[in-house]
């Protein structure tokens, strides 16, 4: 951003008083790194720490951020404010040092709320579909020349980043319910894609509390704000009479304000039309597969039309959408030495997400054998949704199961990869292969792959690094057998 553009931005969005250097603990996460990037481009000094370097930290360093590997008390010296990710606890040495030095410590969502304060905020919440919906909206607004600021939980392929500082009043961002921190946000438009049991440890195992928290999030809208919600979701349908804000519904349901009709998947693309609120129809081609992604597109259209985004920009952006990192990301088809095999990677880590991804994969390549490499994410989620996982994972042709990616949690007996394998095996339809570490997966794949297979790697942990490794090896049988 040029000095002239930044000066113009400052006429709309004043600086945070007395804040010069902002320190991020856990800066390597996509959400934290995205906010840090926007603030760096706004002219703030950025520093941060994490336990290891990654693409996010390397990118931020290229923007001038000071990155420290490891958490040490001295890292926070000179900071005006410290921002912490969900994974950072009060006993972190940098948090303790900041409090001793009386430096404000705020959560990620509080800093996002500050970015949103003077902007037209569009916040996307829900158990599933947040990242894709946020990316679709950002792409549509960019296509229309609206130049939005966006903060996304995944890499927007067309932009080459997950965050960008725009010159307009629009800020498009994911709203994270995992720790209820989305309640800090006060957007002008709030989307809720669905509400299912997840992160239940945050809500004391009480689904009623989770439901009430989503309602509170919607009530953070001003009275002149707009809620956009998926009426196909039974919990949202039940909530509708309680939402005291202007509301637009979308879905496949006949009574949706914006209804998805005539859905057809062609390979890894989709075609459908939307019946809009005025009764007119909008035919669309979406460069994504799956009925669930048509819903994400419907939410996007509902929001964009309310902001008077031109229809041709909407149509073009959805047809040309270049995707999001780790959301049905196709690495391509490789000649393995035993035939041609397609590699796809996906972030889905909840049974509903896995089910939707498997359905989209089957629809795209119905004649091909589906080999799933799955890594459960969090022991609490595996425990709470154990039967659902066992049911959906049994529906592939070959299942390679990794152990649980802990994400900082302590192990829970019976809520692990081996136990899931036993439960699936007892169903009698599939014999899963348990693999203790991602490093062992290439060798196992080398023994099971056949010509025409689709390999789908799925999960929210480090299985994404595994998929990149497999792509580097080009799924070569010989290379995978010797990989370490």
UniProtKB/Swiss-Prot annotation:
Record pathway:
Cell wall biogenesis; peptidoglycan biosynthesis
Keyword set, alphabetical order: ATP-binding, Cell cycle, Cell division, Cell shape, Cell wall biogenesis/degradation, Cytoplasm, Ligase, Nucleotide-binding, Peptidoglycan synthesis
Q: Pfam families, alphabetically?
A: Mur_ligase, Mur_ligase_C, Mur_ligase_M
Task: Write down the EC number.
Answer: 6.3.2.8
One GO biological process term: regulation of cell shape
What InterPro entries does the database record attribute to this sequence? Mur-like_cat_sf (IPR036565), Mur_ligase_C (IPR004101), Mur_ligase_C_dom_sf (IPR036615), Mur_ligase_cen (IPR013221), Mur_ligase_N (IPR000713), MurCDEF_pg_biosynth (IPR050061), UDP-N-AcMur_Ala_ligase_MurC (IPR005758)
This one is known as: UDP-N-acetylmuramate--L-alanine ligase
Name the species this protein comes from. Tolumonas auensis (strain DSM 9187 / NBRC 110442 / TA 4)
Gene label: murC
């Amino acid at each position: 951003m040029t000095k002239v553009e930044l000066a113009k931005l400052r006429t709309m969005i004043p600086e945070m008083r007395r804040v010069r250097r902002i320190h991020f603990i856990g800066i390597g996460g996509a959400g934290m790194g995205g906010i840090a990037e926007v603030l760096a481009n706004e002219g703030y000094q950025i520093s941060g720490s994490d336990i290891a370097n990654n693409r996010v930290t390397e990118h931020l360093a290229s923007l001038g951020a000071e990155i420290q590997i490891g958490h040490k008390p001295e890292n926070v010296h000179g900071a005006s404010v410290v921002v912490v990710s969900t994974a950072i606890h009060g006993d972190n040495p940098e948090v303790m040092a900041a409090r001793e030095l009386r430096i404000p410590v705020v959560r990620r969502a509080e800093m996002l709320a500050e970015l949103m304060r003077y902007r037209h905020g569009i916040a996307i919440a829900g158990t599933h579909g947040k990242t894709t919906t946020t990316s679709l909206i950002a792409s549509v607004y960019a296509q229309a020349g609206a130049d939005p600021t966006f903060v996304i939980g995944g890499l927007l392929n067309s932009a080459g980043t997950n965050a960008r500082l725009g010159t307009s009043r629009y800020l498009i961002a994911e709203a994270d319910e995992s720790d209820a921190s989305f309640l800090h946000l006060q957007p002008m438009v709030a989307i809720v894609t669905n509400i299912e049991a997840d992160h239940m440890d945050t809500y004391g195992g009480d689904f009623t509390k989770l439901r009430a928290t989503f309602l509170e999030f919607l009530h953070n809208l001003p009275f002149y704000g707009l809620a956009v919600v998926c009426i196909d979701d039974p919990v949202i349908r039940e909530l509708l009479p309680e939402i005291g804000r202007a509301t637009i519904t979308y879905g496949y349901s006949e009574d949706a304000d914006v209804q998805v009709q005539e859905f057809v998947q062609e390979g890894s693309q989709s075609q459908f039309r939307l019946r809009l609120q005025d009764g007119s129809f909008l035919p669309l081609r979406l460069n994504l597969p799956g009925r669930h992604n048509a819903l994400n597109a419907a939410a996007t259209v509902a929001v964009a039309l309310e902001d008077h985004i031109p229809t041709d920009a909407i149509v073009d952006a959805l047809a040309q959408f270049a995707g999001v990192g780790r959301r049905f990301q196709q690495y391509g088809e490789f000649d393995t030495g035993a035939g041609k095999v397609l590699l796809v990677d996906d972030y889905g880590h909840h049974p509903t997400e896995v089910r939707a991804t498997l359905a989209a994969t089957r629809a795209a390549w119905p004649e091909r054998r589906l080999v799933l490499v799955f890594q459960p994410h969090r022991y609490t989620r595996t425990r709470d949704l154990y039967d659902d996982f066992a049911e959906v994972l049994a529906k592939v042709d070959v299942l390679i199961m990794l152990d649980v990616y802990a994400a900082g949690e302590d192990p829970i007996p019976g809520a692990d990869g081996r136990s899931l394998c036993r439960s699936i095996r007892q169903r009698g339809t599939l014999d899963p292969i348990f693999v203790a570490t991602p490093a062992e997966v290439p060798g196992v794949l080398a023994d099971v792959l056949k010509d025409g297979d689709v390999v789908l790697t799925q999960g929210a942990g480090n299985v994404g690094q595994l998929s990149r490794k497999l792509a580097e090896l080009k799924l070569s049988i010989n290379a995978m057998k010797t990989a370490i």
